C-alpha cells in the first residue's frame, strides 16, 4: 500500500465494523484523532446458511444494521462488501476438511488472515485509504532500532486477542491500526454509552462459531 504524497489531506482509515461495540468505538477513536473514516462490514454468510448449517458469525443482518446506524451517527461513509463465496471456500470448507481429518481448526485465525487483513487491505488501497482499523484488543508498535512492526498483547489481559493476529505479515502490520489495544473493556463500553451508540450494551461477538458438522 502506497502512502499518500499529499501531506495536506487527512489520512484515510477503513474501519472493519462488525456491528459490535468494539469496532464502533475503534471508529469513533480514529475519527476523534483526525482520520477520514469509512466503515465497512463484511457479509460472510447468507441468513439461510446461519439457520441451517449451525454457523454463527458476526456481521449478521442485525449486526449490519447496527454498524450502519453507528456509521450514520458518526456521519461517515459505510459499505457492505459481499465475501460469501470466499468465506465458504477459504474458511468453512477448510474447517470441515481439518475437522474431519481429526484436527482442531481455528476459523477466526483464518478469517483474520484471508478475509479481514487480505481483502480489506486491498480494498482500502484501491480506495485511497491508508489504514485498516479493527476492534481487536492488541497493539502494533514499530521497533525504533530495527524498523520492524511488533504485535503485542492488549493491556486488558482478560480481552487480549493478539493470538488471533499472530500470522499477519510486516506489510499488513504496517497498515493496521488497533486503537483499543491500550484500553480496558469497561472503558470501551463507557465511551459507547457516552456516544449513545445503539450497541453500547451489546454482548461481545465471537467472529465465528461453527457447530459440529453433521455426519450422514
Regions found by a protein language model. Name each.
Residues 1-167, 177, 185-188:
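ATP-dependent adenylation/nucleotidyltransferase module used to activate substrates
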Residues 189, 198-203:
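Catalytic core of tubulin tyrosine ligase-like
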Residues 208-214:
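Conserved small/polar residues in nucleotide/adenosyl-binding loops
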Amino acid at each position: 500500500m502506497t502512502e499518500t504524497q499529499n501531506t495536506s489531506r487527512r489520512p484515510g482509515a477503513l474501519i472493519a465494523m462488525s456491528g459490535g461495540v468494539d469496532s464502533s468505538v475503534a471508529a469513533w477513536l480514529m475519527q476523534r484523532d483526525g482520520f477520514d473514516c469509512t466503515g465497512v462490514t463484511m457479509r460472510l454468510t447468507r441468513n439461510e446458511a446461519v439457520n441451517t448449517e449451525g454457523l454463527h458469525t458476526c456481521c449478521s443482518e442485525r449486526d449490519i444494521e447496527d454498524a450502519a446506524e453507528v456509521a450514520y451517527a458518526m456521519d461517515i461513509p459505510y459499505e457492505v462488501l459481499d465475501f460469501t463465496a470466499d468465506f465458504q471456500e477459504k474458511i468453512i470448507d477448510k474447517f470441515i476438511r481439518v475437522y474431519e481429518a481429526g484436527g482442531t481448526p481455528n476459523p477466526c485465525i483464518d478469517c483474520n488472515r484471508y478475509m479481514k487483513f487480505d481483502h480489506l487491505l486491498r480494498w482500502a488501497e484501491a480506495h485511497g485509504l491508508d489504514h485498516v482499523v479493527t476492534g481487536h484488543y492488541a497493539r502494533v508498535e514499530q521497533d525504533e532500532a530495527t524498523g520492524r512492526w511488533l504485535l503485542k498483547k492488549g493491556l486488558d489481559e482478560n480481552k487480549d486477542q493478539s493470538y488471533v493476529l499472530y500470522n499477519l505479515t510486516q506489510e499488513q502490520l504496517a497498515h493496521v491500526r488497533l486503537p483499543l489495544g491500550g484500553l480496558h473493556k469497561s472503558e470501551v463500553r463507557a465511551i459507547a454509552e457516552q456516544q449513545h451508540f445503539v450497541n453500547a450494551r451489546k454482548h461481545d461477538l465471537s467472529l465465528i462459531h461453527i457447530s459440529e458438522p453433521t455426519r450422514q
